[in-house]
Design a protein with these regions (language model features):
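Catalytic cysteine-centered active-site loop
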Residues: 284-342
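Short loop segments at secondary-structure junctions
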Residues: 64, 159, 317, 358-360
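Extracellular adhesion/carbohydrate-binding repeat motifs centered on closely spaced tryptophans
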Residues: 1-280
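Extracytoplasmic/periplasmic, Sec-exported soluble proteins
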Residues: 53, 80, 175, 276-277, ...
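Aromatic- and glycine-rich peptidoglycan recognition patches
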Residues: 14, 273-284, 319-336, 350-352, ...
Length: 387
């Protein structure tokens, strides 16, 4: 039984006709032929929202006065034809909050009942900040997955519709494992380029937003990002069996000569891979081209003699050679002349040099420089080579 304004009580299944009512002052519900109507001071509500304080609900009455049930209704609110979409349940009550219909979720304002469109923050029992979702600007249906909105990419959980924030893995047509991207922690917009997150540096492709992993070229230099986490790496790194070095501040891959921890290291000018030990020995030795010969000399400041020079060069690589050429000749492993490689010692009677390739030796002559190993003079005095 429904209580009516005006102290008239009607059963919903009663067939009560308008002629039986004092319509001039009648207010409230009226039922006829299974339809519900509403009167205000005897006037039938038509194309009108009505609030019933006793049920604490809003209702909509069509142009013929019948109450809308299980229906979406557009209500014009302004002279320009704009208004709001509303929804009424099977009892005719205006729907408020989340509503699931025909396979889609919708949201209706808790005060006005207006269908939400665009971004909406929904209350969540397990999160005081709620969750941001997105409703289609035309249909009002909750959207899922990647969405391009006003010039920005967003991602909404495929089950809950919740907007993604932070580092997120999303589907990628080119990779069964998906791609890692980053959404701003506040706006949810996809971010690009270098990003500083929780004390670590990452890089996201400037077109696709995909997180960089491994050795990665950008802005004129190579960088290295952890193959799992994507965090930028610094210092010495082993990649596919080769050694590389990445600047400890910028993360950029170094090439050529690098001085660190009191020693010199050499990396390929193109690939950045550390050169083999022999090649590094040659590169370092060539730093002293033109240094004068000094008998007994053991440093660039005083000049070098032959064994002082080789001892100094090899010490940069942790190789401890004896002081004299004859003692150095007895160190290491003997190498046939046909197998000699850059960085090997070439030993003569009373002299020692470094083989640099292409039948060239490099030694403390006066000044330090190159000589032709195949020349008759050096062949005449050659004793052997060692490694």
């Amino acid at each position: 039984m429904l209580a009516l304004a005006g102290c008239i009580l009607l059963w919903p299944n009663q067939q009560t006709y308008a002629a039986e009512l004092q319509k001039d002052n009648y207010n409230g519900w009226y039922y006829e032929n299974g339809q519900a109507y509403w009167y205000d001071n005897g006037v039938l509500a038509r194309s009108k929202e009505v609030y019933d304080p006793q049920t604490d609900a809003w209702y909509w009455f069509e142009a013929d006065g019948t109450m809308a049930r299980d229906k979406d209704v557009f209500i014009v609110l302004n002279a320009d034809g704009t208004g709001k979409w509303t929804r009424y349940d099977s009892d005719g009550r205006m729907v408020k909050g989340e509503s699931y219909k025909n396979g889609a979720w919708y949201y209706f304002d808790l005060t006005t009942g207006a269908m939400a469109k665009g971004f909406v923050n929904l209350p969540q029992s397990d999160d005081p900040n709620g969750k941001w979702v997105y409703y289609d600007p035309i249909t009002g249906k909750m959207q899922y997955g990647e969405q391009y909105i006003d010039g920005y990419w967003y991602y909404f959980d495929t089950a809950t519709g919740k907007m993604a924030h932070g580092i997120t893995n999303i589907p990628d047509n080119d990779d069964a494992g998906g791609k890692w991207v980053y959404y701003d922690s506040i706006t949810g917009r996809m971010q690009y380029g270098e990003q500083y997150i929780d004390g670590n540096r990452y890089y996201f492709d400037t077109v696709t937003g995909k997180m960089a992993h491994g050795k990665y070229y950008r802005d004129g230099a190579y960088y290295y990002y952890d193959t799992v986490t994507g965090i930028m790496q610094y210092g010495e790194q082993t990649i596919d069996g080769d050694e590389y070095y990445f600047d400890t501040e910028t993360g950029a891959m170094v090439t050529g000569e690098v001085e660190r921890d009191g020693r010199y290291y050499y990396y390929d000018d193109e690939t950045g891979a550390m050169l083999g030990l022999g090649e590094q020995i040659v590169k370092y030795a060539e730093k002293f081209l033109g240094t004068p010969y000094t008998w007994g000399g053991t440093s660039p400041d005083t000049g070098f003699d032959c064994s002082g020079f080789t001892q100094y060069v090899y010490s940069n690589f942790g190789i401890d050679l004896d002081r004299t050429s004859s003692a150095q000749r007895r160190q290491g492993e003997a190498v046939d002349e046909d197998d000699i490689m850059p960085g090997d010692l070439v030993c003569y009677s009373g002299h020692v040099a470094i083989y640099v390739g292409n039948n060239q030796i490099y030694h403390a002559s006066d000044p330090i420089g190159y000589a032709d190993l195949s020349s008759s003079y050096w062949q005449q005095h050659l004793i052997g080579a060692g490694r």
